[in-house]
C-alpha cells in the first residue's frame, strides 16, 4: 500500500517521506512502512502466489494480496519512469547513458539477489540501451540474460556516470559523501539524507 501512496504522492507533488515522518509523531499504534523499488527474497514475492493459486482453485481469490503483488511488481517500471523524467529535465537521454546501481541485493547487508527488484531495473535499463554498472560489497559478479554486468570498484568518484540509483541501503554506503556528488542521484529507499537526491 505504501508504494501506491508513494506513486500518488509524487503525482500530487507531496513528499511521501514527510508524510511517513509526520505519521511517526502519533503517540501510539504507528507501524512504519516505507516505499521502495519493489520486494525481493525467497518469501514475500513468492509465497503469496501459492496462496493466490490455491484460493482461486476454490473460487475465492485474495484480491488485496494480488493487488499488492501487482503494485510491488510494477515498481521497477516506476523507478525507470522517474529516472527518465529526472534525466530529461537535465537534457540527458536514457539511451546510451551511463548508470550506476548501488546495491543489487534484495535487502541490506547480505549478498542475496533472489527476486531482487534491482535485476528487473537493470534489465529494463539495458532494454533502453543504457550502459549499466553496479557496486555491491556483497556481490562480486552479476549476469542478467547472459550479459555480465560490469562491477564498479571505485565508489569515491561518480563523475563518469549520468545517474546513480541507490537500490540497496548497505551500511557501508553510509561512508559515501553523497553531498559532494554532482551526478544525478535517485534513492529508491529513502534511507540516506542527501539534499541533492530525488527519492522514490
Task: Label each residue range with its predicted role.
Residues 1-200:
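Structural/interface elements that position substrates and couple domains in central-metabolism enzymes
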Amino acid at each position: 500500500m505504501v508504494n501506491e501512496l508513494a506513486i500518488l504522492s509524487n503525482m500530487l507533488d507531496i513528499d511521501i517521506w514527510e508524510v511517513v515522518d509526520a505519521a511517526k509523531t502519533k503517540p501510539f499504534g504507528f507501524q512504519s512502512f516505507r516505499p521502495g523499488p519493489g520486494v525481493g527474497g525467497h518469501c514475500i514475492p513468492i509465497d503469496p502466489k501459492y496462496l493466490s493459486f490455491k484460493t482461486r482453485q476454490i473460487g475465492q481469490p485474495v484480491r488485496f494480496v494480488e493487488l499488492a503483488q501487482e503494485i510491488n511488481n510494477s515498481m521497477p517500471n516506476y523507478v525507470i519512469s522517474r529516472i527518465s523524467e529526472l534525466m530529461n529535465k537535465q537534457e540527458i537521454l536514457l539511451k546510451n547513458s551511463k548508470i550506476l546501481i548501488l546495491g543489487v541485493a534484495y535487502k541490506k547487508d547480505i549478498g542475496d539477489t533472489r527476486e531482487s527488484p534491482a535485476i528487473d531495473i537493470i534489465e529494463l535499463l539495458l532494454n533502453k540501451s543504457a550502459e549499466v554498472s553496479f557496486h555491491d560489497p556483497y556481490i562480486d559478479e552479476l549476469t542478467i540474460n547472459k550479459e555480465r554486468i560490469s562491477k564498479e570498484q571505485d565508489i569515491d568518484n561518480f563523475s563518469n556516470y549520468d545517474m546513480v540509483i541507490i537500490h540497496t541501503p548497505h551500511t557501508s554506503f553510509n561512508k559515501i559523501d553523497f553531498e559532494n556528488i554532482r551526478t544525478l542521484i535517485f534513492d529508491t529507499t529513502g534511507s540516506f539524507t542527501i539534499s541533492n537526491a530525488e527519492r522514490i
